[in-house]
């Protein structure tokens, strides 16, 4: 719902008093089947209680959900040049800066579907460039999807069908604390509660294996290479599956006999899944590791069923990529400077552009966590952020906005890219959605 005070009436931001979705304040309330926006899995089975002290996760919590839902908001008001102003004035100043800019950069993009659609509309109107703060990790996937294609599974298919799960070079438990609980070792499956136990293989040493336990898990195997060598180990696995001889008797400490044993497990699997998380693959040319993971899937589909599953997707990055794709035809790093969408994954990477002095205004959206700080830059910055967002210096314009799924309703695209999940308004604070603020800025241009 559009906040009527955005363009004129005085604002009071934020109020942490409990309220209903309509804005009417109420006593404590308990919410069932709450979707969590604080990681890409968007677990939608939480129970959250709201009282006059704030929110508390009562059921199906993890560290990320507790930190996100139960965070106390500091006082925050709209600012222009570091001084408190009414919201309408901040919006008018933001519109003025965008109207004067020759090449505005729209970054951060931690928002929901509606917020991202508003970003795309404003970027098109102002001739700007769109890129998510975490797109460097996303492009480890995009480059392979664009050049060779892939075969992927979903969270539900993996949960219900997989008998072999290979975790490739990625600390999945750190990124998704409930992945093993919900997907790898759930209490039952959709098709057969007496399904045989599944084998879990970790390729990489130092990965958190503590959650790889439960009644659904049989053998847990580790091939202890450096995580950045996981692609090379999988490449050797592909070679052995194809019948090639390898001269080295080991790959980064992984014995060829262990690779051969994994090859035999892959041959016998009825439904295998290779899991990786691009944020974990933080080394040069990591897309080549992703190419090996997806190539293994293609090879094995000649004789059995195998699929990939890419994880990650924090800060609404999956949503940003999805909305950008269906709105412009391109997955982020899109320029509207010519009046039409233009795509270049190098030229329009906002991180590179800021480092090299390109662009004359940064519009930064960070509505989910307080950790997605705008990068240091000499150009004016407009920030639409959750209260408590870490800022190195006062931006030209600061507008506090709500978190989707906490302060207002919304939608986020899940990490497997097959569904957008509805987010509830839990009434934590009376903060406007980023989508409403962006629409008001566009209306004021």
Residues covered by each model-derived region:
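Internal hydrophobic scaffold segments of catalytic domains
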Residues: 48, 298-311, 394
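N-terminal, charge-rich interaction modules
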Residues: 28-45, 282, 311-329
């Amino acid at each position: 719902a559009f906040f009527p005070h955005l363009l004129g009436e005085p604002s009071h931001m934020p109020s942490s008093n409990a309220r209903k979705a309509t804005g009417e304040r109420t006593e404590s309330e308990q919410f069932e089947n709450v979707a969590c926006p604080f990681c890409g899995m968007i677990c939608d089975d939480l129970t959250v209680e709201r009282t006059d002290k704030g929110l508390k996760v009562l059921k199906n919590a993890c560290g990320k959900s507790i930190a996100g839902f139960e965070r106390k908001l500091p006082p925050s008001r709209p600012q222009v040049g570091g001084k408190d102003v009414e919201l309408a004035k901040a919006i008018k100043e933001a519109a003025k800066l965008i109207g004067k800019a020759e090449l505005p950069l729209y970054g951060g993009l931690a928002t929901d579907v509606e917020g991202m659609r508003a970003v795309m509309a404003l970027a098109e109107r102002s001739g700007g460039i769109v890129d998510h703060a975490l797109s460097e990790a996303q492009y480890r996937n995009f480059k392979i999807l664009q050049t060779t294609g892939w075969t992927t599974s979903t969270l539900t298919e993996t949960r219900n069908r997989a008998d072999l799960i290979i975790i490739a070079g990625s600390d999945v438990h750190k990124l998704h604390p409930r992945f093993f609980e919900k997907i790898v070792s759930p209490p039952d499956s959709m098709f057969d509660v007496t399904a045989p136990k599944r084998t879990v293989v970790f390729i990489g040493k130092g990965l958190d294996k503590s959650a790889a336990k439960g009644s659904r898990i049989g053998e847990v195997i580790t091939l202890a290479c450096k995580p950045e060598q996981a692609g090379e180990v999988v490449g050797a696995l592909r070679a052995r599956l194809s019948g090639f001889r390898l001269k080295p008797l080991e790959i980064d400490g992984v014995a060829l006999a262990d690779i051969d044993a994994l090859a035999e497990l892959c041959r016998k699997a009825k439904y295998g899944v290779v899991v990786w998380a691009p944020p974990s693959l933080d080394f040069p040319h990591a897309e080549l590791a992703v190419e090996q993971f997806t190539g293994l899937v293609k090879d094995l589909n000649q004789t059995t069923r195998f699929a990939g599953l890419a994880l990650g997707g924090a800060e609404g990055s999956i949503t940003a990529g999805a909305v950008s794709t269906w709105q412009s035809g391109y997955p982020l790093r899109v320029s509207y400077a010519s009046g039409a969408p233009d795509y270049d994954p190098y030229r329009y990477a906002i991180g590179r552009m800021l480092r090299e002095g390109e662009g004359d205004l940064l519009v930064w959206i960070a509505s989910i966590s307080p950790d997605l700080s705008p990068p240091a830059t000499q150009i004016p910055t407009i920030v639409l952020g959750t209260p408590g967002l870490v800022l190195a210096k006062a931006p030209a314009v600061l507008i506090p906005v709500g978190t989707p799924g906490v302060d207002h309703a919304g939608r986020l695209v899940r990490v497997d890219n097959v569904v957008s999940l509805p987010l509830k308004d839990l009434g934590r604070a009376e903060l406007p959605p980023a989508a409403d603020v962006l629409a008001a800025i566009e209306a004021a241009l």
